[in-house]
Amino acid sequence: MRLARRLALTLSLPLAAVSLAACGSGINLDEPIEGPSWRLVLLGDQPVAPGDDPARNPQLQFDRNSGRMSGSGGCNRMSGSYTRSASQLKLGQIAATKMACGDPARNTLETQFFQALQATASYRLQGPGRMALLDGTGRTVAVFEAVR
């Protein structure tokens, strides 16, 4: 009886520690990143205003079944692979169309957006419908809002 109680206590302590650690992580696997389109709202610490044409706003969408992400940089469509495990998020090589972007500011935004995606090492959900991408040092490189 005493051995059974000790064994139960020994096994329950690590489980409790893992549960408590997950509470502060900002990760809710019940609310996956797959599904909604994610519109870019901050690039680094710079706000990104939505454009007149929602289809041309910088955005991402993740497809769990294929392990692929797709979206728009603002001028060009893009796609690539991704893997995620807990809070880790790794985006593969990004392929993008090569359409000319008439607005130099939009072109610069797209280039910086693609660079931020390539620097991504993890993500954090920041409440309902808001996701931050972080680089390897934990610095926020981009923030998105869900568009359903």
Regions found by a protein language model. Give the residues of each.
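Lipid interaction determinants
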Residues: R2, R6-L11, V18-R148
